[in-house]
């Protein structure tokens, strides 16, 4: 297979690509119930609709009192009833009267404090003795003390996390405006590819010279695991045929916001992605990035603002493009400004060096924890075809073009798994 010179890749700086990415339009918005918003991106501020709490409420189990009645203790009060959380009291306290309240219950009218029950003696004749004085608003959550109507609870662009939902509901926010999920369609190209269907077929396919499709599946699994505000709406395998590839890509464009292709990005006579992209007449097309692995990566923006991303067929090259390019495209189109944190640590390089004068690089590394320090213990062979090395690592190091990390220096590591703890004897 001869390479075609017109297909040779001209490398572009990542900064150029990021400018294109950050100019992409965001997807439409929709209103959904708050309890369905986990992992979604707010398209508008989540605004508190009422004062919270709307009435004074008890912060402890105990006895609601008028603080003026227990200035001097012990004080004998008449017990007129009780209030539990989930109801609105229809009683009011008169002089020297009290009511039992549970945590979170609204206070009877005229009550301005709660005496915790351990400081109260029940006499059994409808009276109690209070043995601790309280000041106004002691052990009480006053009306509006959590939030006022019109307060912003979460800002637009925030990814809603599981723990945000109960807090939003407590503030009375029953629905929120979010970006719809970014839709993604994946096209795996290659006449050598076969779909994994039966476990016993995998080894037989390899022996017969076929390649079990795994790169597109990795993309789908990565999105499902790490990008909750996106969804893969389809995935297909097509042979090395330009018409078949173009039909699959056009189908993806009609059903998704982003089409991701794998394979066919090289300059050989059976690599057709370049021809397909030219036929689409993109408004913007960058092919070839100054990064390794993943130099043949391409990104195109069409006239209808749909995006097509071309990735290598090698999982390792695609993993780099996923974490550096694809994730940023999806974040931009989803309108993400505040997303979930990534598991990153600063680790010490104890031997060798990392980095490249001409290319941005991603390295697969093994990180261990020794005491309070993270150490890059092992760097396996870095070839993009060595997919099995993904089982030997637990982190990725990204170095920008021209950035060199020398022995003894620290570098940021994106963790893929928990680091091995050398100080924990249970791991030995």
What is each residue range found by the language model?
Residues 2-8, 12, 24, 63-234, ...:
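Short, glycine/charged-enriched hinge/interface segments at domain edges or termini
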Residues 2-11, 174-311, 315-325, 428:
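Helix-rich terminal scaffold detector
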Residues 3, 57, 129, 148, ...:
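C-terminal terminal segments
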Residues 21, 62, 150, 186, ...:
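Residue-level signal for inorganic ion chemistry
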Residues 30-34, 55-77, 110-125, 367-390:
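Short beta-strand/loop turn elements enriched in aromatics
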Residues 56-58, 69-72, 90-94, 107, ...:
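Solvent-exposed alpha-helices and their adjacent loops that cap or buttress functional pockets
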Residues 322-343:
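A charged, well-structured terminal subsegment
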